[in-house]
Amino acid sequence: NFDGTQLYEYDSDVGHSEWGTCNFNYYRREVCSFLNSAAALWMEVYHCDGIRMDAISRALYWQGDPARGVNEGAVTFLRNLNHGLNDRWPTGVYMAEDSTNFLKVTAPTRYDGIGFDYKWDMGWMHDTLDYFATPFGQRPDAYGKIIFSMHYFYNELYLLALSHDEVVHGKKTIIDKLWGTYEEKCAQLRTLYFYMYAHPGKKLNFMGNELGHFREWDEKRELDWDLLKYPFHDAFQKYFGVLSRLYATQPALYAGEYDPRCFEWVASESRDEGVYAWLRKGAGQTILCVMNTQNTAHKKFPLYLSFPAGAEELLNTEAPCWGGTDKSKPKALHTSDGGVYGRDYTLTVDLPAMGSRMFKLTPEAPRPEAAQASARRAAAARRKAARTQNARADAAAYNSKK
């Protein structure tokens, strides 16, 4: 404020944020030019791979409060900024950290969107960490936290992030947030990251997450590389690498991850057992992901599928090579006839405590009797639908005569 007036910020009560910093006045062209130049500097001079913009809700809404209305000047600025960045550096990745329900954050600007490539899924991050911090006995009541993210996931192009924000300022590191003893934390950490990589959406992790770091991040010192002298942390780093390679080499885990047709729940009501299972589909491949979040093992747990298949294990988070306790040897599994919920086939799997398993499914020809039973059920469903349609037509005709 060289002459006593505001230079970059507003001159009213919206001039400062809740953190005491100034809010830029996006209605002044010189301010927008300054911010555009700052973003371009990171891309052109420092050759960054992309830009992540923090707390954009404070720009989208006045003081970050939807009740105060949309800041149209900020919306226009963000659209122009993203359009310019994508035009000059089309391979860059431009991300928004936003905890609001503002629409079209990741829609292209030509469709009146804000133009970001991805939006951080803050809800997924909070719900996941809250769930894994919950004592085992209380997890049935929190079961829905793991399911909830898929209710809104396809509204935007979401990115799953466990970033620097989650390992500073007394929040504890990822592994230290988890409930239980040291051994239980270690097992659950493998399952938490299994869930992250098997969940639709791009992934982002902060340095040190791959080590199972117990000390919070400190910008004044390097990571605790000595942790790799300990068996769990050394094994976890290797596990993290294998998990990342699985994500990169199994098309079903990334192809179509923003297409709702490529995801299907298999088990989402096993609250007492703490079991979740889902299918990922893409590029002609189907992968079954099964997660046990309780500290008790489940033998011969039934999973119901709509097609007969063989199952080849890709990953077991409780394998001894990762420090796990499941010493069983991988073997090919096959569905059996019979099921529930309109699914005609059952795959039975053993689930270690706090462990997860991933299978590649190969469709098999249905047995004649199973195919006939399925055809009979389909025919019965068609007859029921026809009766319902006829009844509605009769009711409409009757009402029209009244």
Place the predicted regions along the sequence by residue:
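Aromatic/hydrophobic pocket-lining residues that form the small-molecule binding cavity
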Residues: 32-35, 39, 74, 78, ...
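Catalytic cores of secreted or luminal carbohydrate-active enzymes
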Residues: 232-253
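Trp/Gly-enriched beta-strand surface patches
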Residues: 309-341
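Short, low-complexity intrinsically disordered segments enriched in A/P/G/S/L with frequent Arg
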Residues: 395-396
